[in-house]
Amino acid sequence: MQTPTRSVLVLLAGLFLTFAAVSVAPGSDIPPHGKAVVLFKGHDLRNFDTFLRAQGLNHDPDHVFLVENGVIHVSGKEFGYIITRKEYANYYLRAEFKWGEGTYAPREGQARDSGILFHVQGAQKVWPTSIEFQIVEGGTGDFWMTDGGALTGTDGVRVTGPPGKASKIDRIGKGPWTNVAGYRDPVGELENPRGEWNLLELVVQGDHVRQFVNGKLANEGSAAYPSSGKILFQSEGAELFFRDIRLYPLKK
């Protein structure tokens, strides 16, 4: 049996990494139509504004959002968000997150909660008109339609968030849910154990939306309203971290 050469080993390693990456990429059947838009490069929040319920726009004296060690540390101690300065439509978005330790009032001791709100329109507030890719212990992958946002689920039922409130579409295969810190879905948990990184992927084409958690389809909807807008990442009473936030343009 011949011993593989160094060049062959390098080639095989490269192929393994390529196939490993593809295996968790739900957008692999939807080729990007342009260069990646790297929203967070690990250094600063130059592509975002901040908004906090108690502090307003771009005033974060307590460092609720802090870039350190190449990741965004979200303390969760105040309700608010970082929001892209530009609007987007027709894209594949990927981001990684993991939970920290802390939970804070008014959600102290409750399931750790955050989210990625997309197609954001209207005035800066908690929370603006949008559709949410929910991030919550035991329920990551749910849809929430907020303040007039609307979506039709795979069952054909259209769900609209009332003014100033939100309405939900549960993720596919979701089991019973309990609002307690550390909760994990006993039926179909998609998250990795707390403290480990999770991959979130969002595919938006026209008014059709798909959400993936760690490579698995979590939810799907159509006739999205709005169908374009800014993208925000929440602080909602729980400590968490985000990294590697990238967006790839898609054809409609």
What are these regions (language model features)?
Residues 24-252:
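Carbohydrate-interacting regions of secretory-pathway proteins
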Residues 1-6:
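N-terminal secretory signal peptides that target proteins for export/translocation
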Residues 10-20:
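Bacterial N-terminal signal peptides
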